[in-house]
Swiss-Prot record:
Entry-linked HAMAP family: Azoreductase_type1
Subunit and interaction comment: Homodimer.
Residues annotated for FMN binding in this entry: S10, S16, Q17, S18, M91, Y92, N93, F94
Species for this entry: Aeromonas salmonicida (strain A449)
First-tier enzyme category under EC: oxidoreductase
Alphabetic keyword roster: Flavoprotein, FMN, NAD, Oxidoreductase
Role played: Quinone reductase that provides resistance to thiol-specific stress caused by electrophilic quinones.
Protein's name in the database: FMN-dependent NADH:quinone oxidoreductase
Length: 195
């Protein structure tokens, strides 16, 4: 039995292809312990100067900083306690959803999920794999317009998650036939993963 953390980030609700793919994946993992975070409804704060300063810690934190520090600690504990994190990362304007970026800003903390050394940064999230599910309106895999894959691989690797699989559902905005084909290909990729 595995501990699975699921991060949904689509703003499309019931029309979300990434949510539908995740739900299909979870149907095959009912014996696992699953925590689902819908980042689109969680209203995580956008990082600003006050919050960035607060996330570094200290003795003189204000109420807002203390609340966000507690929220960050909770999100990090969920992540570190997971064997697998399943991340919905649909491509919006060549990037990830703001809601997912807000989560990343709260869990990427020096001394907590990574540390700097003389030889470079070292990730502190250990024994966790990641599965990134990324629907896209067009065809972007392997091209310069795919900014999602290198970003997610880099940020996850930076905090210590090196074992990352990507599932792509491409052509979601190219008509019903392309959409159906993209969904079927993504489902096929999910079925072949040994997770």
């Amino acid at each position: 039995m595995a501990n699975i953390l699921v991060l949904k980030s689509s703003i499309l609700g019931q029309y979300s292809q990434s949510n539908a793919l995740i739900d299909g994946f979870l149907a095959d993992h009912q014996s696992d312990t699953v925590t689902v975070r819908d980042l689109a409804t969680l209203n995580l704060p956008v990082l600003d100067g006050e919050l960035a300063s607060g996330l570094r810690g200290g003795d003189n934190l204000n109420e807002r900083q203390l609340a966000v520090m507690a929220q960050s600690d909770e999100l990090i504990a969920e992540l570190k306690g997971s064997d697998l994190v399943v991340i919905a990362a649909p491509m919006y304007n060549f990037s990830i959803p703001t809601q997912l970026k807000n989560w990343i800003d709260l869990i990427a903390r020096a001394g907590v999920t990574f540390r700097y050394t003389e030889t470079g940064p070292v990730g502190l999230v250990e024994n966790t794999r990641a599965l990134v599910i990324s629907p896209r309106g067009g065809m972007h895999v392997g091209s310069a317009t795919d900014l999602v894959t290198p970003y997610m691989r880099t940020v996850l690797g930076f905090i210590g998650i090196k074992d990352v699989d990507f599932i792509y559902a491409e052509g979601m905005g190219m008509g019903p036939d392309a959409q159906a084909k993209g969904i079927e290909q993504a489902k096929g990729q999910l079925e072949t993963l040994a997770l």
